[in-house]
Amino acid sequence: VGNGNRFYLKPAAAVSTARRAGTTATWDQLNKYFGLMQMPIVTSQYWNLVHGGFGGQVEQDVEGLQTMRTLARNMAFMLKCKQVALENGVAMPEREKSTFTNFVR
């Protein structure tokens, strides 16, 4: 799928926002792309979403903002861990060449 090395093992986090419904389905779909690229998915204490319909309303979503702060700390931790590992000789996992098959043979 394209240049698989570009995103390989780069921590990723999807965030979705909406007035009401639809954010969890969007978040699920975005995370699938990270999985295809072998990207560790960074999470928070809840799904990475906030609610608000107009400018300034997201700032009123206290739980959503807490989720974003936790997500930011978790992302920073993952990036620091990766950097420390690389600086101390922890090798990236060996990648296998992709094999493509049909579900039915």
Region spans (language model):
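Glycine-rich phosphate/pyrophosphate-binding loop and the adjoining helix
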Residues: 40-105
